[in-house]
A protein has these predicted regions:
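N-terminal regions that are enriched for targeting/export leaders
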Residues: 96-129
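Bacterial N-terminal signal peptides
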Residues: 60-69
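Long, intrinsically disordered low-complexity tandem-repeat segments
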Residues: 11-55
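C-terminal motif of bacterial Sec signal peptides marking the signal peptidase cleavage site
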Residues: 71-73
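Papain-like cysteine protease catalytic cores
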Residues: 164-264
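Active-site signature of cysteine proteases
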Residues: 77, 248-430
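Second-shell loop/turn segments in exported
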Residues: 129-141, 184-192, 307-314, 323-324, ...
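Bacterial lipoprotein signal-peptidase II cleavage site
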Residues: 75-82
Protein backbone atom coordinates (compact mmCIF):
# COMPACT_ATOMS: atom_id res chain seq x y z
CA UNK A 1 0.00 0.00 0.00
CA UNK A 2 2.84 2.39 0.90
CA UNK A 3 4.64 1.51 -2.31
CA UNK A 4 1.52 2.24 -4.27
CA UNK A 5 1.21 5.65 -2.54
CA UNK A 6 4.90 6.41 -3.24
CA UNK A 7 4.40 5.46 -6.86
CA UNK A 8 1.35 7.74 -7.14
CA UNK A 9 3.24 10.63 -5.58
CA UNK A 10 6.14 10.12 -7.94
CA UNK A 11 3.78 10.16 -10.93
CA UNK A 12 2.15 13.39 -9.70
CA UNK A 13 5.56 15.02 -9.15
CA UNK A 14 6.73 14.11 -12.64
CA UNK A 15 3.48 15.37 -14.12
CA UNK A 16 3.94 18.71 -12.36
CA UNK A 17 7.47 18.94 -13.69
CA UNK A 18 6.28 18.27 -17.22
CA UNK A 19 3.51 20.86 -16.91
CA UNK A 20 5.87 23.38 -15.44
CA UNK A 21 8.22 22.87 -18.35
CA UNK A 22 5.33 23.20 -20.80
CA UNK A 23 3.74 26.33 -19.24
CA UNK A 24 6.67 28.42 -18.14
CA UNK A 25 9.88 26.56 -17.34
CA UNK A 26 11.12 26.63 -20.91
CA UNK A 27 14.51 27.49 -22.14
CA UNK A 28 15.09 31.13 -23.01
CA UNK A 29 14.90 30.45 -26.74
CA UNK A 30 11.55 28.67 -26.45
CA UNK A 31 10.19 31.37 -24.18
CA UNK A 32 11.20 33.97 -26.75
CA UNK A 33 9.28 32.16 -29.46
CA UNK A 34 6.10 31.92 -27.33
CA UNK A 35 6.45 35.49 -26.18
CA UNK A 36 6.60 36.57 -29.80
CA UNK A 37 3.44 34.60 -30.52
CA UNK A 38 1.54 36.25 -27.64
CA UNK A 39 2.45 39.87 -28.22
CA UNK A 40 5.99 40.37 -26.98
CA UNK A 41 7.24 41.15 -30.48
CA UNK A 42 10.29 43.03 -31.48
CA UNK A 43 9.78 46.73 -32.37
CA UNK A 44 9.97 46.18 -36.14
CA UNK A 45 7.25 43.53 -36.10
CA UNK A 46 5.05 45.67 -33.89
CA UNK A 47 5.35 48.61 -36.31
CA UNK A 48 4.36 46.47 -39.30
CA UNK A 49 1.26 45.07 -37.57
CA UNK A 50 0.23 48.48 -36.22
CA UNK A 51 0.47 49.96 -39.71
CA UNK A 52 -1.65 47.14 -41.12
CA UNK A 53 -4.30 47.65 -38.47
CA UNK A 54 -4.30 51.39 -39.15
CA UNK A 55 -4.78 50.84 -42.88
CA UNK A 56 -7.73 48.51 -42.20
CA UNK A 57 -9.39 51.02 -39.88
CA UNK A 58 -8.87 53.81 -42.42
CA UNK A 59 -10.40 51.71 -45.20
CA UNK A 60 -13.42 50.84 -43.03
CA UNK A 61 -13.94 54.51 -42.11
CA UNK A 62 -13.76 55.59 -45.77
CA UNK A 63 -16.27 52.92 -46.80
CA UNK A 64 -18.69 54.02 -44.07
CA UNK A 65 -18.28 57.67 -45.04
CA UNK A 66 -18.89 56.87 -48.73
CA UNK A 67 -22.06 54.91 -47.93
CA UNK A 68 -23.42 57.79 -45.81
CA UNK A 69 -22.75 60.28 -48.63
CA UNK A 70 -24.42 58.04 -51.22
CA UNK A 71 -27.50 57.49 -49.06
CA UNK A 72 -27.83 61.20 -48.30
CA UNK A 73 -27.41 62.10 -51.97
CA UNK A 74 -30.06 59.65 -53.11
CA UNK A 75 -32.63 60.62 -50.48
CA UNK A 76 -32.38 64.40 -50.83
CA UNK A 77 -35.53 65.70 -52.61
CA UNK A 78 -35.52 68.26 -55.39
CA UNK A 79 -37.16 71.53 -54.40
CA UNK A 80 -39.51 73.24 -56.82
CA UNK A 81 -38.16 76.67 -55.93
CA UNK A 82 -34.43 77.43 -55.96
CA UNK A 83 -33.14 78.64 -52.61
CA UNK A 84 -29.75 79.14 -51.04
CA UNK A 85 -30.71 77.16 -47.96
CA UNK A 86 -29.88 79.92 -45.51
CA UNK A 87 -31.64 80.11 -42.18
CA UNK A 88 -34.31 82.78 -41.87
CA UNK A 89 -35.05 84.51 -38.57
CA UNK A 90 -36.68 82.00 -36.20
CA UNK A 91 -37.01 79.74 -39.24
CA UNK A 92 -36.11 76.28 -40.44
CA UNK A 93 -33.02 75.21 -42.32
CA UNK A 94 -32.88 73.55 -45.70
CA UNK A 95 -31.08 70.60 -44.10
CA UNK A 96 -34.45 69.31 -42.92
CA UNK A 97 -35.50 68.85 -46.54
CA UNK A 98 -33.32 65.73 -46.68
CA UNK A 99 -36.02 63.85 -44.78
CA UNK A 100 -38.08 61.23 -46.56
CA UNK A 101 -41.04 63.17 -47.93
CA UNK A 102 -42.45 60.94 -50.64
CA UNK A 103 -45.36 59.48 -48.67
CA UNK A 104 -47.67 61.35 -46.35
CA UNK A 105 -49.50 58.49 -44.72
CA UNK A 106 -52.25 59.53 -42.32
CA UNK A 107 -53.12 63.09 -41.39
CA UNK A 108 -51.64 62.51 -37.95
CA UNK A 109 -48.25 61.70 -39.47
CA UNK A 110 -48.24 65.02 -41.31
CA UNK A 111 -49.12 66.96 -38.17
CA UNK A 112 -46.50 65.13 -36.11
CA UNK A 113 -43.82 65.80 -38.71
CA UNK A 114 -44.64 69.51 -38.91
CA UNK A 115 -44.66 69.87 -35.13
CA UNK A 116 -41.41 67.90 -34.75
CA UNK A 117 -39.52 69.97 -37.32
CA UNK A 118 -40.87 73.22 -35.87
CA UNK A 119 -39.98 72.12 -32.33
CA UNK A 120 -36.36 71.49 -33.36
CA UNK A 121 -36.14 75.14 -34.39
CA UNK A 122 -37.88 76.63 -31.38
CA UNK A 123 -41.26 77.08 -33.07
CA UNK A 124 -44.45 75.84 -31.39
CA UNK A 125 -47.49 74.90 -33.46
CA UNK A 126 -50.56 76.40 -31.76
CA UNK A 127 -53.22 75.47 -34.33
CA UNK A 128 -53.31 73.02 -37.22
CA UNK A 129 -56.50 72.09 -39.04
CA UNK A 130 -56.94 68.65 -40.62
CA UNK A 131 -55.70 68.47 -44.20
CA UNK A 132 -55.97 66.20 -47.22
CA UNK A 133 -52.71 64.91 -48.75
CA UNK A 134 -50.53 67.52 -50.45
CA UNK A 135 -51.03 67.46 -54.22
CA UNK A 136 -48.67 68.44 -57.02
CA UNK A 137 -49.80 70.88 -59.70
CA UNK A 138 -46.84 69.87 -61.88
CA UNK A 139 -46.24 71.96 -65.00
CA UNK A 140 -49.46 73.92 -64.80
CA UNK A 141 -50.63 77.38 -63.77
CA UNK A 142 -53.40 76.03 -61.56
CA UNK A 143 -52.27 76.98 -58.04
CA UNK A 144 -55.54 78.94 -57.67
CA UNK A 145 -57.55 75.75 -58.23
CA UNK A 146 -55.49 73.68 -55.79
CA UNK A 147 -55.52 76.35 -53.07
CA UNK A 148 -59.27 76.99 -53.26
CA UNK A 149 -60.12 73.27 -53.18
CA UNK A 150 -57.69 72.67 -50.30
CA UNK A 151 -59.43 75.38 -48.25
CA UNK A 152 -62.80 73.71 -48.84
CA UNK A 153 -61.39 70.27 -48.00
CA UNK A 154 -59.75 71.33 -44.73
CA UNK A 155 -62.84 73.22 -43.60
CA UNK A 156 -64.97 70.12 -44.18
CA UNK A 157 -62.39 67.90 -42.48
CA UNK A 158 -62.37 70.16 -39.40
CA UNK A 159 -66.14 69.65 -39.21
CA UNK A 160 -65.74 65.87 -39.40
CA UNK A 161 -66.68 65.55 -43.08
CA UNK A 162 -64.14 63.86 -45.33
CA UNK A 163 -64.00 65.28 -48.86
CA UNK A 164 -61.16 65.27 -51.41
CA UNK A 165 -61.85 67.18 -54.63
CA UNK A 166 -60.42 66.83 -58.14
CA UNK A 167 -58.36 69.78 -59.45
CA UNK A 168 -58.27 68.16 -62.89
CA UNK A 169 -62.04 68.44 -63.24
CA UNK A 170 -61.91 72.21 -62.74
CA UNK A 171 -58.86 72.42 -65.01
CA UNK A 172 -60.75 70.59 -67.77
CA UNK A 173 -63.68 73.01 -67.53
CA UNK A 174 -61.31 75.98 -67.57
CA UNK A 175 -59.68 74.53 -70.69
CA UNK A 176 -63.06 74.17 -72.43
CA UNK A 177 -64.00 77.78 -71.57
CA UNK A 178 -60.72 79.22 -72.79
CA UNK A 179 -60.73 77.16 -75.98
CA UNK A 180 -64.25 78.37 -76.84
CA UNK A 181 -63.23 82.00 -76.38
CA UNK A 182 -60.04 81.48 -78.36
CA UNK A 183 -61.88 79.87 -81.28
CA UNK A 184 -64.75 82.38 -81.36
CA UNK A 185 -62.34 85.34 -81.19
CA UNK A 186 -60.21 83.78 -83.95
CA UNK A 187 -57.21 83.57 -81.66
CA UNK A 188 -57.42 87.08 -80.24
CA UNK A 189 -58.35 85.76 -76.77
CA UNK A 190 -55.26 84.55 -74.93
CA UNK A 191 -55.39 80.83 -74.16
CA UNK A 192 -54.32 81.06 -70.50
CA UNK A 193 -54.94 78.66 -67.61
CA UNK A 194 -53.89 81.23 -65.02
CA UNK A 195 -56.45 82.53 -62.58
CA UNK A 196 -57.41 83.82 -59.13
CA UNK A 197 -59.10 82.16 -56.16
CA UNK A 198 -62.64 83.42 -56.90
CA UNK A 199 -62.39 81.93 -60.40
CA UNK A 200 -62.28 78.47 -58.83
CA UNK A 201 -65.51 79.27 -56.97
CA UNK A 202 -67.09 80.32 -60.28
CA UNK A 203 -66.13 77.01 -61.89
CA UNK A 204 -67.53 75.08 -58.93
CA UNK A 205 -70.87 76.88 -59.06
CA UNK A 206 -71.33 76.67 -62.82
CA UNK A 207 -69.66 73.40 -63.84
CA UNK A 208 -69.69 71.39 -60.61
CA UNK A 209 -67.07 69.22 -58.92
CA UNK A 210 -65.76 65.66 -58.87
CA UNK A 211 -64.19 63.59 -56.07
CA UNK A 212 -60.44 63.23 -56.44
CA UNK A 213 -60.59 59.45 -56.78
CA UNK A 214 -63.19 59.70 -59.56
CA UNK A 215 -61.24 62.05 -61.82
CA UNK A 216 -57.47 62.19 -61.45
CA UNK A 217 -54.27 60.66 -62.77
CA UNK A 218 -51.32 59.07 -60.92
CA UNK A 219 -48.94 61.83 -62.06
CA UNK A 220 -49.52 65.57 -62.62
CA UNK A 221 -50.85 66.60 -66.03
CA UNK A 222 -49.06 69.25 -68.06
CA UNK A 223 -52.08 71.46 -68.68
CA UNK A 224 -49.95 74.02 -70.50
CA UNK A 225 -49.07 71.48 -73.18
CA UNK A 226 -52.63 70.15 -73.22
CA UNK A 227 -54.04 73.65 -73.82
CA UNK A 228 -51.62 74.21 -76.71
CA UNK A 229 -52.66 70.92 -78.31
CA UNK A 230 -56.33 71.81 -77.79
CA UNK A 231 -55.96 75.17 -79.58
CA UNK A 232 -54.17 73.57 -82.52
CA UNK A 233 -56.83 70.86 -82.79
CA UNK A 234 -59.70 73.36 -82.57
CA UNK A 235 -58.23 75.67 -85.18
CA UNK A 236 -58.23 72.82 -87.68
CA UNK A 237 -62.02 72.47 -87.45
CA UNK A 238 -64.42 74.52 -89.62
CA UNK A 239 -67.33 74.69 -87.15
CA UNK A 240 -67.71 75.53 -83.48
CA UNK A 241 -69.26 72.16 -82.55
CA UNK A 242 -66.44 70.21 -84.16
CA UNK A 243 -63.89 72.49 -82.50
CA UNK A 244 -65.45 71.79 -79.09
CA UNK A 245 -65.33 68.05 -79.72
CA UNK A 246 -61.66 68.34 -80.69
CA UNK A 247 -60.86 70.15 -77.43
CA UNK A 248 -62.82 67.58 -75.41
CA UNK A 249 -60.84 64.80 -77.10
CA UNK A 250 -57.57 66.46 -76.06
CA UNK A 251 -58.83 66.63 -72.46
CA UNK A 252 -59.98 62.99 -72.60
CA UNK A 253 -56.54 61.92 -73.81
CA UNK A 254 -54.90 63.79 -70.93
CA UNK A 255 -57.05 62.80 -67.95
CA UNK A 256 -59.88 60.60 -69.24
CA UNK A 257 -63.56 61.12 -69.97
CA UNK A 258 -65.77 62.71 -67.33
CA UNK A 259 -68.02 60.35 -65.33
CA UNK A 260 -71.68 61.32 -65.85
CA UNK A 261 -72.53 61.06 -62.13
CA UNK A 262 -70.91 61.27 -58.72
CA UNK A 263 -71.56 58.40 -56.30
CA UNK A 264 -71.04 59.39 -52.67
CA UNK A 265 -72.24 57.57 -49.54
CA UNK A 266 -74.77 55.54 -51.49
CA UNK A 267 -76.28 58.56 -53.26
CA UNK A 268 -76.00 59.69 -56.88
CA UNK A 269 -75.27 63.32 -57.71
CA UNK A 270 -74.69 65.38 -60.80
CA UNK A 271 -71.37 67.27 -60.72
CA UNK A 272 -73.23 70.54 -60.02
CA UNK A 273 -75.29 69.02 -57.20
CA UNK A 274 -72.15 67.53 -55.67
CA UNK A 275 -70.39 70.91 -55.81
CA UNK A 276 -73.32 72.60 -54.07
CA UNK A 277 -73.17 69.99 -51.31
CA UNK A 278 -69.53 70.85 -50.53
CA UNK A 279 -69.47 74.57 -51.39
CA UNK A 280 -72.53 76.80 -51.15
CA UNK A 281 -72.65 79.81 -53.44
CA UNK A 282 -72.51 82.23 -50.49
CA UNK A 283 -70.01 80.30 -48.38
CA UNK A 284 -66.77 82.07 -49.32
CA UNK A 285 -65.89 85.76 -49.66
CA UNK A 286 -62.89 87.58 -51.09
CA UNK A 287 -61.00 90.32 -49.21
CA UNK A 288 -58.08 92.60 -50.03
CA UNK A 289 -56.39 95.71 -48.59
CA UNK A 290 -55.09 98.52 -50.81
CA UNK A 291 -55.39 102.28 -50.41
CA UNK A 292 -55.76 103.17 -54.10
CA UNK A 293 -59.41 102.10 -53.64
CA UNK A 294 -61.73 103.22 -50.81
CA UNK A 295 -62.17 100.85 -47.87
CA UNK A 296 -65.50 99.19 -47.24
CA UNK A 297 -66.34 98.63 -50.91
CA UNK A 298 -66.21 95.75 -53.37
CA UNK A 299 -63.52 96.58 -55.90
CA UNK A 300 -62.34 94.98 -59.11
CA UNK A 301 -58.69 94.41 -58.24
CA UNK A 302 -56.26 95.15 -61.07
CA UNK A 303 -54.70 91.71 -61.51
CA UNK A 304 -53.58 90.26 -64.83
CA UNK A 305 -55.02 86.86 -63.87
CA UNK A 306 -58.44 88.21 -62.84
CA UNK A 307 -59.93 86.93 -66.10
CA UNK A 308 -63.53 86.79 -64.83
CA UNK A 309 -63.46 90.34 -63.47
CA UNK A 310 -64.15 89.25 -59.88
CA UNK A 311 -64.53 91.77 -57.06
CA UNK A 312 -62.79 91.84 -53.66
CA UNK A 313 -64.02 93.60 -50.53
CA UNK A 314 -61.41 96.21 -49.60
CA UNK A 315 -60.61 96.54 -45.86
CA UNK A 316 -57.78 98.04 -43.76
CA UNK A 317 -54.74 95.83 -43.22
CA UNK A 318 -55.43 95.18 -39.52
CA UNK A 319 -58.97 94.12 -40.42
CA UNK A 320 -57.61 91.72 -43.03
CA UNK A 321 -55.38 90.03 -40.43
CA UNK A 322 -58.27 89.95 -37.96
CA UNK A 323 -60.47 88.18 -40.54
CA UNK A 324 -57.71 85.64 -41.14
CA UNK A 325 -57.28 84.87 -37.43
CA UNK A 326 -61.00 84.70 -36.75
CA UNK A 327 -61.52 82.27 -39.61
CA UNK A 328 -58.79 79.96 -38.29
CA UNK A 329 -60.24 80.19 -34.78
CA UNK A 330 -63.55 79.04 -36.24
CA UNK A 331 -61.82 76.01 -37.82
CA UNK A 332 -62.09 77.37 -41.35
CA UNK A 333 -59.08 77.29 -43.66
CA UNK A 334 -58.24 80.42 -45.67
CA UNK A 335 -57.19 80.72 -49.31
CA UNK A 336 -54.14 82.98 -49.68
CA UNK A 337 -53.10 84.79 -52.85
CA UNK A 338 -49.91 86.79 -52.95
CA UNK A 339 -46.25 87.31 -53.78
CA UNK A 340 -43.65 84.54 -53.51
CA UNK A 341 -40.96 86.10 -55.71
CA UNK A 342 -39.31 87.59 -52.62
CA UNK A 343 -35.84 86.56 -51.48
CA UNK A 344 -37.31 85.79 -48.07
CA UNK A 345 -39.62 83.09 -49.49
CA UNK A 346 -37.50 79.95 -48.90
CA UNK A 347 -39.46 76.96 -50.06
CA UNK A 348 -36.81 74.32 -49.33
CA UNK A 349 -36.39 75.60 -45.78
CA UNK A 350 -40.14 75.87 -45.26
CA UNK A 351 -40.24 79.51 -44.14
CA UNK A 352 -41.04 82.95 -45.57
CA UNK A 353 -40.23 86.27 -43.92
CA UNK A 354 -39.39 89.86 -44.77
CA UNK A 355 -36.32 91.74 -43.48
CA UNK A 356 -36.66 93.32 -40.05
CA UNK A 357 -35.73 96.64 -41.59
CA UNK A 358 -39.01 96.73 -43.54
CA UNK A 359 -41.86 98.57 -41.82
CA UNK A 360 -44.94 96.38 -42.33
CA UNK A 361 -47.45 99.22 -42.52
CA UNK A 362 -50.40 99.96 -44.78
CA UNK A 363 -48.38 102.71 -46.46
CA UNK A 364 -45.30 100.55 -47.13
CA UNK A 365 -47.50 97.73 -48.40
CA UNK A 366 -49.17 100.11 -50.87
CA UNK A 367 -45.83 101.56 -51.94
CA UNK A 368 -44.49 98.11 -52.83
CA UNK A 369 -47.67 97.26 -54.75
CA UNK A 370 -47.55 100.55 -56.69
CA UNK A 371 -43.90 99.94 -57.62
CA UNK A 372 -44.67 96.35 -58.68
CA UNK A 373 -42.50 94.99 -55.89
CA UNK A 374 -45.53 93.03 -54.69
CA UNK A 375 -47.03 90.88 -57.45
CA UNK A 376 -49.77 88.28 -57.74
CA UNK A 377 -47.62 85.14 -58.12
CA UNK A 378 -49.09 82.18 -56.32
CA UNK A 379 -51.91 80.79 -54.18
CA UNK A 380 -51.64 78.77 -50.94
CA UNK A 381 -54.02 77.54 -48.25
CA UNK A 382 -53.53 78.75 -44.66
CA UNK A 383 -54.40 75.92 -42.26
CA UNK A 384 -52.76 76.81 -38.95
CA UNK A 385 -50.65 79.06 -36.74
CA UNK A 386 -47.35 78.82 -34.89
CA UNK A 387 -45.16 81.01 -32.70
CA UNK A 388 -41.40 81.02 -32.12
CA UNK A 389 -39.66 81.32 -28.77
CA UNK A 390 -38.74 84.88 -29.79
CA UNK A 391 -42.42 85.71 -30.19
CA UNK A 392 -42.57 85.70 -34.00
CA UNK A 393 -46.04 84.66 -35.22
CA UNK A 394 -46.36 82.37 -38.23
CA UNK A 395 -49.19 81.07 -40.38
CA UNK A 396 -48.91 77.47 -41.59
CA UNK A 397 -49.72 77.26 -45.30
CA UNK A 398 -50.29 74.23 -47.51
CA UNK A 399 -48.75 74.36 -51.00
CA UNK A 400 -49.38 72.41 -54.21
CA UNK A 401 -45.81 71.57 -55.22
CA UNK A 402 -45.78 68.10 -53.72
CA UNK A 403 -44.06 67.06 -50.50
CA UNK A 404 -40.71 68.47 -51.57
CA UNK A 405 -39.41 70.57 -48.69
CA UNK A 406 -38.57 70.47 -44.98
CA UNK A 407 -42.24 70.55 -43.95
CA UNK A 408 -43.48 68.01 -46.51
CA UNK A 409 -45.41 70.45 -48.67
CA UNK A 410 -46.14 73.14 -46.06
CA UNK A 411 -44.48 76.47 -45.33
CA UNK A 412 -44.43 78.95 -42.43
CA UNK A 413 -45.41 82.46 -43.47
CA UNK A 414 -44.45 85.02 -40.85
CA UNK A 415 -47.16 87.51 -39.90
CA UNK A 416 -44.92 90.25 -41.27
CA UNK A 417 -44.75 88.44 -44.60
CA UNK A 418 -48.54 88.02 -44.69
CA UNK A 419 -49.04 91.71 -43.90
CA UNK A 420 -46.71 92.83 -46.68
CA UNK A 421 -47.20 90.27 -49.45
CA UNK A 422 -50.86 89.23 -49.32
CA UNK A 423 -52.83 90.28 -52.40
CA UNK A 424 -56.15 88.67 -51.43
CA UNK A 425 -57.74 86.22 -48.99
CA UNK A 426 -60.58 83.74 -49.55
CA UNK A 427 -62.40 83.62 -46.20
CA UNK A 428 -65.33 81.41 -45.27
CA UNK A 429 -68.59 82.96 -44.10
CA UNK A 430 -69.43 82.53 -40.43
Amino acid sequence: MCKMMDMAGLIKTEARDVNATAYGCMKPAARGVNATAHGCMKPAARDVNAAARGMKLTAIFLLLLLSVVLVAGCSRPTARKDTDGATATDGLTAADSAAQVTDHGARGDVARHIMAVCRRHGVTVTLLLPVTPVKNQGRSDLCWVYAALAAIESTHAAAGDSVNLSPDYLARNMLMRQARLNWLSRGRHDMSMRGTLPMALHLLREDGAMPYDSYSTPSPINWRATSRRAVLAANCEPTFDRAERAVATCADNAVGSVPPHVFMLGAEYSPVDFAQSVCRSDEWHMFTSFTHHPFGRDIQLELADNQFGDTFHNVPLDTLIHLLDRSLDNARAVGWEGDISEEGFRWAAGVADVPRTVACTQQERQRQFDRRLTTDDHCLTIVGRAVSRRGTRYYIAKNSWGATNALRGFILLSERYVRMKTVALMVGAE
